[in-house]
Amino acid sequence: MQPDASAATAGRCRAAKSAGCYLSRRAAWLQLVQSSNDTMCVMEDDITLLDGFKPATLELHDTRHHWDMVRLMGITKRPQVEYATLPSGMRIMWMDSHPTGTQCYMITRQAAARMLAYTANIVHAIDIAFDRSWEHGQRLYITSPEYVADPGMPTMITDRSDSRTFGQRLKAKYHRKIERISSRRFNDEHRPKRPITIEIAPAAAEATPTLA
């Protein structure tokens, strides 16, 4: 099957206009679920593709049983733990704390279905929901090296000012503490203990798909 490619609305999902960004991500996932494709590469339209991007997406497609979602770039740098090395030498890395952003990532059809269920109600901005592995349970990684760059174009979505009351901020602080406990427990259970090497069967290599 071919991986699909989708360019989402430009800009970060961080502010008052983020509902459209949220819905555009869900529309891409629904497109994958309703298709015959096994994976999709979801991209924002203001990114720069680096050398090796297409071979990386094809290799990720061929090794899709080992992951659910894989970023090809992250906004912020976080400590990484190696999960796997692929035949090309590309590595798939685990992070306890994800680098935020949904500029470019691969997702499997099964993961897209689960993320649609998880994001059925808008609770968090979509890039925040994407990172909440301890809730949605998806195997979320990032590639090393990264194959996409953000040229730093201005976003169409501006930051939201904090208009919460003192009581609301206090309640949010309590919930963040509970979430840190849940996140730490999830990471301790699922963090790779030792890196693995993934081989691609000849049949899969011969059926190398192309990006749409």
Report residues per predicted region.
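An acidic/histidine-cluster motif and surrounding catalytic segment
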Residues: 1-43, 47-212
